[in-house]
Design a protein with these regions (language model features):
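Nudix hydrolase/Nudix homology domain
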Residues: 15, 52, 60, 85-125
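A short coil-to-beta-strand element that immediately follows conserved catalytic motifs
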Residues: 46-53
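Conserved Nudix-box catalytic region and its N-terminal flanking loop in Nudix hydrolases
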Residues: 1-37, 75
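Short aromatic/basic micro-patch
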Residues: 18, 69, 92
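Active-site-adjacent beta-strand/loop module that shapes the phosphate/pyrophosphate-binding cleft
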Residues: 59-79
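Short loop segments at secondary-structure junctions
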Residues: 1, 8, 72-77, 95-96, ...
């Protein structure tokens, strides 16, 4: 099962279903450190077993943004630590449920789609 977050996105003026994500606190911060922090802050779970999955370049014609995707295994419950303006619901889904949500259009976030599909390929699911 994969943990997903449902949160309101102002740019779309609606809620979206995404994988937990965030940005580096400092340009020198390692992606895996950021991933661990954001996982715990947004979901209330931590993992001592984060594994690099893929690196994405979002729009190579326009910017140099890079997104690193990690898979978190053996989750340990802690507690959410949300920003004042964050309201996030957390729910676990099977990979098959998430694939259906992608192809029905319920999941539109590109990093989430890429991560789910990469996970499915890597783990032959």
């Amino acid at each position: 099962r994969l943990l997903m977050v449902r949160q309101y996105r102002n740019a779309l003026e609606r809620y979206t279903l995404e994988l937990p994500a965030g940005k580096l606190d400092d340009p020198k911060e390692e992606g895996i450190v950021c991933a661990a922090r954001e996982l715990e802050e947004e979901t209330g779970y931590r993992s001592d077993k984060l594994e690099w999955l893929i690196t994405l370049r979002t729009t190579v014609a326009f910017c140099d943004e890079r997104i690193e995707i990690f898979a978190a295994h053996d989750l340990i419950p802690t507690r959410q630590n949300l920003d004042e303006d964050e309201y996030i619901d957390v729910k676990a889904y099977t990979l098959d449920e998430l694939k259906k949500k992608i192809f029905s259009g319920e999941i539109e976030d590109s990093k989430t789609i890429a991560a789910i599909m990469a996970y499915a390929v890597k783990y032959n699911r």
